[in-house]
Regions:
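Bacterial N-terminal signal peptides that target proteins for export
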Residues: 1-6
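C-terminal motif of bacterial Sec signal peptides marking the signal peptidase cleavage site
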Residues: 13-16
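Well-ordered beta-sheet/strand-loop patches within structured domains
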Residues: 18-84, 88, 93, 233-234, ...
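Zn2+-dependent metallopeptidase catalytic domains
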Residues: 21, 26-186, 191, 196-206
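Generic structural signal for hydrophobic core residues of well-folded globular domains
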Residues: 119, 123, 235-240, 382, ...
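Short acidic, glycine/serine/threonine-rich helix-capping segments at coil-helix boundaries
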Residues: 129-133, 138-141, 145, 152-165, ...
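Short, hydrophobic/amphipathic alpha-helical patches that form generic packing surfaces
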Residues: 223-242
Length: 691
């Protein structure tokens, strides 16, 4: 909690500024005027007579305010919490500590209102307003404006006849020849105490009083200026500046700090250079993610925020209902579905066609089997509190801020909970197709002693570099040990019957063909997890709304359409050539001239093309772990030791199993239960050993 800003607290800063305004080292900041083009004496006289009072006030305010800003940012015990004081000091030093938001005279620049409005609107971006401490900021600005009244008490600067005569005398004297800018010269004379160049006796007499009044305001000016800029940069950081993803090697901590500082510097400079309020707003509007889903989620979050503010919805004890039923629960169901916009008809106790349509819409947007009936799964979903639904939407918005997509114009996005992948090009979604992702089998991690998803499709980004037609499947060691070796121990002819080849070093691969789990094409984006997109010989899984059946790779529903699209965009698609390759059946690699970014990400909430909010399955509990981390911490387990085994060839070329002690096991004469203990983990469907 920030300390209360008051005259007493600001006193420390004001004291630190006491000796800065009138000494020979006074900073001139932005008040210093550039030398104008040479003018006639008459033009100079007119300029000085009309502009000098305004320029003098600006010069004075800039001098003491600039010094106060520098002093505040160097204080170890500053009266307010400036999170980025070191960075701000270097940024303001680059502009001689000239303020961006205050004018040093109790007034605010055109940049303030858009920044304040944006900070107050942070809740619309699912960012906590309290993070930017707007009450303290508002208090600082209010105090600054109150201190501005001190200058008003001194009264406006009005040149006397004696001052005007002195100006005319100066212009008529030889002293004008030594000054590139007469206004600048007289201003320096007043600040640096050179009476020989300050022929304004009446003004000189009131100068000290005006300096004291400006100094009293300077502390409040510095606090308001630094606090507002600090919060503006904090907002920029929270939106996207924190995101350090790069396709290159992950930056070191030092390099990451440099990148963030560079981004914040760019925002600082853009705000300082913005010529008017609309330009400031343009700078601020460019900070949030520009990806389409983010913009669609904002009004959805606002709608659910309003539902929560009105008390949310009540839980309904469910029962199976279908069209034609009459029951008091039907009215409650209609009212409940109406709250989220799924039902728009009258509230009564008849389960009519309109309600059936609404139930089907709810099922379709919540990854259920669509049958229009209210079963146990339906009620469990419907009774999730509104607060939790809002939290899911807001977390999804945060995940979009964390997205690795960046400024890519052409990319493939795999959204794991959505069980779909999309191809985007120049802001347009060219393709959307179903996928199967890693299953939800859980094992005990021996390192953390907590349950984890053994086959979860990893979140990552990499460049797709090539496609392979008629691919071999090189079986990963884990799948070999956990599934193929047990199959071999049960049936000594299993490898031969299923087109599996074994090399002398124990590696195993499946030949191209109808039984190959990779189907007819795979799409390679080299990555540490060795996962990829591919066709499949098990197409029945695509009929299910929740499609978590693989060992981590992503099975594509329309692989040949994706292949045609990618090769066409790459300028090398030839239908007849592809057909001949499939007919030959030999493995055939095709490199992409321009690699395509592939982003595998995790968004539980999605807005569909009709504008409905889709709440998808949190299949790997990643959202749960962030929203309710205590549940994840409680999932402790004891690792189960399993025998390590590998394949070797016998002297006559038959596959043999070698256990951890080096013993050879003949698959044709072994009971698998004697070698491998049964696992109680829920794995893929029987016989589905594909990637």
């Amino acid at each position: 909690m920030h300390p209360r800003l008051s005259v007493v607290i600001l006193g420390a800063l004001l004291m630190a500024c006491q000796d800065t305004a009138t000494g020979s080292n006074a900073q001139q900041g932005s008040g210093e005027l550039a030398g104008p083009p040479r003018m006639s004496v008459a033009e100079l006289r007119e300029r000085l007579h009309t502009e000098f009072p305004t320029q003098y006030a600006q010069w004075l305010a800039a001098s003491v305010t600039s010094e106060a800003i520098g002093t505040l940012l160097l204080m170890n015990d500053a009266p307010v919490d400036i999170q980025r004081a070191g960075l701000l000091y270097s940024l303001y030093a680059g502009r001689e500590f000239a303020p961006v938001f205050v004018d040093g005279q109790g007034g605010l620049t055109h940049r303030v209102q858009p920044v304040i409005a944006t900070l107050l609107d942070a809740r619309q971006h699912a960012l906590p307003v309290q993070q930017f401490d707007t009450p303290t900021l508002a208090q600082a600005l209010s105090m600054y404006e109150e201190f501005g009244a001190i200058l008003s008490d001194v009264g406006p600067l009005i040149l006397t006849r004696a001052d005007l005569d002195a100006i005319d005398e100066l212009l008529a004297s030889d002293r004008i020849a030594s000054a590139a800018d007469p206004v600048d010269a007289m201003m320096r004379a007043l600040f640096e105490g050179d009476p020989a160049l300050a022929p304004l006796p009446e003004l000189a007499a009131s100068h000290e009083a005006r300096v004291r009044a400006a100094r009293a305001l300077a502390g409040a000016s510095a606090v308001a200026e630094a606090l507002l800029m600090d919060r503006a940069l904090d907002y920029a950081f929270a939106q996207r500046h924190f995101n350090l993803f790069t396709f290159d090697e992950e930056p070191s901590e030092e390099e990451g700090q440099r990148i963030v500082a560079e981004r914040l510097t760019g925002t600082f400079q853009a705000l300082a250079d913005a010529p008017d309020a609309p330009a400031v707003q343009t700078v601020l509007d460019a900070l949030p993610p520009t990806l389409p889903q983010y913009a669609l989620l904002m009004p959805a979050a606002a709608r659910y925020r309003e539902i929560v503010a009105q008390g949310g919805w009540n839980e309904i004890d469910g029962l199976t209902l279908r069209r034609g039923n009459r029951h008091v629960k039907v009215a409650a169901l209609k009212e409940r579905l109406q709250m989220e916009g799924y039902y728009t008809g009258p509230i009564d106790e008849t389960f009519d066609q309109a309600l059936k349509d609404a139930v089907e819409l709810y099922e379709r947007t919540h990854q259920m089997e669509v049958d229009g009936e209210t079963d146990r799964t339906f009620w469990a979903s419907l009774n999730i509190p509104a607060e939790e639904r809002l939290a899911q939407i807001e977390l999804t918005m945060q995940r979009w801020r964390e997205s690795r997509i960046g400024d890519d114009l052409y990319y493939i996005l795999v959204n794991i909970p959505d069980f779909h992948a999309e191809v985007w090009r120049n802001g347009v979604r060219d393709m959307r197709f179903r996928i199967v992702v890693g299953n939800t089998q859980r094992v005990c991690d021996p390192r953390t002693e907590r349950m984890r998803y053994a086959n979860a499709t990893p979140l990552q980004s990499a460049y797709m570099t090539h496609l392979v037609l008629n691919p071999y499947w090189n079986v990963p060691r884990r799948i070999l040990e956990e599934e193929l070796i047990p199959n071999l121990l049960e049936d000594g002819n299993y490898f031969e019957e299923n087109g599996i080849e074994q090399s002398e070093d124990g590696t195993v691969r499946l030949r191209p063909g109808p039984s190959n789990p990779l189907g007819r094409v795979k799409f390679i984006f080299p990555n540490p997890h060795a996962t990829y997109l591919h066709d499949t010989n098990r197409r029945n899984y695509f009929q299910f709304p929740v499609r978590a059946f693989s060992h981590g790779c992503m099975r594509v529903h329309e692989p040949e359409n994706l292949m045609e699209y990618l090769l066409t965009q790459d300028g090398q698609y030839n239908e007849r050539d592809i057909e001949r390759s499939f007919e030959r059946g030999r493995e055939d690699g095709r490199s992409l001239t321009t690699p395509v970014p592939v982003h595998v990400e995790y968004y539980v909430v999605r807005i569909d093309d009709e504008g409905y909010v889709n709440f998808n399955s949190d299949i790997y509990k990643y959202d749960r772990d962030r929203l309710r981390p205590e549940e994840a911490r409680n999932e402790r387990c004891e690792p189960e030791a399993r025998p390590g085994m590998r394949l070797v060839l016998s002297e006559d070329g038959r596959p043999m199993v070698q256990d951890a002690e080096g013993n050879l096991i003949d698959p044709s004469a072994t009971n698998v239960e004697e070698v491998i203990p049964a696992s109680d983990g829920a794995g893929p469907a029987a016989g589905d050993y594909g990637p």
